[in-house]
Regions:
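N-terminal assembly/interaction segments in proteins that build large macromolecular machines
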Residues: 1-185
Length: 185
């Protein structure tokens, strides 16, 4: 594909020579319209957009291109999101949901046992709160036992369908946030 006085390959090679870094072009697209504009946020070549319009309006085009860059989409719509991204997001959502469900069960069990969960949410807090006299060594031992027991029991008995439903909801929210056509004003 020609570009200026050479090809795109020539431009990539020239740029590699300037920066001293190996560069590769893994793909390209042609953007066509009656008027095409670009936006390069702060001139840093990190957050850029190219937008084509059906008629020329420099101010509107600049504002739209800038807004698209600010929205930072990864695709136009859900169909454009790579399956690998969706799979990674669903796995993150599943793990996060499981951790939250276990944490909720632990906090409920601690409260039921008469222990404030915020006093025993980490080893540092346990030591600090014992030094302040807010909890006793017996409370810490009881809390550690509750945390270990409830965590293991809850993790082993999480309802899979509930986890999947919550994870799917999180994936839907993610897609709404990263797909240009799904983002809200």
């Amino acid at each position: 594909l020609s570009m200026g006085k050479g090809t795109i390959q020539d431009a990539v090679t020239d740029r590699s020579g300037i920066t001293g870094e190996k560069m590769e072009l893994d793909g390209y697209n042609v953007v066509e319209g009656a008027y095409t504009t670009t936006y390069n946020h702060m001139g840093k070549n990190q957050l850029c957009t190219i937008v084509a319009f059906n008629k020329e309006s420099e101010e509107v085009a600049h504002n739209v291109a800038m807004q698209i860059a600010a929205m930072n989409p990864i695709a136009i719509d859900e169909a454009g999101v790579p399956e690998s991204v969706k799979e990674q997001e669903i796995q993150v959502a599943i793990e996060k949901t499981k951790a939250e469900q276990v944490q909720k069960a632990v906090e409920a069990a601690l409260k039921k046992g008469g222990i404030n969960p915020t006093h025993v949410d980490s080893e540092d807090h346990m030591e600090s709160n014992m030094a302040k006299g807010w909890i006793t060594a017996e409370d810490v031992a009881k809390a550690k036992d509750i945390i270990a027991t409830v965590s293991a029991e809850k993790a082993a008995n999480l309802p899979e369908q509930m986890i999947q439903n919550i994870a799917q909801g999180r994936l839907s929210k993610f897609l709404k946030e990263v797909c240009l056509l799904n983002q809200e004003d």
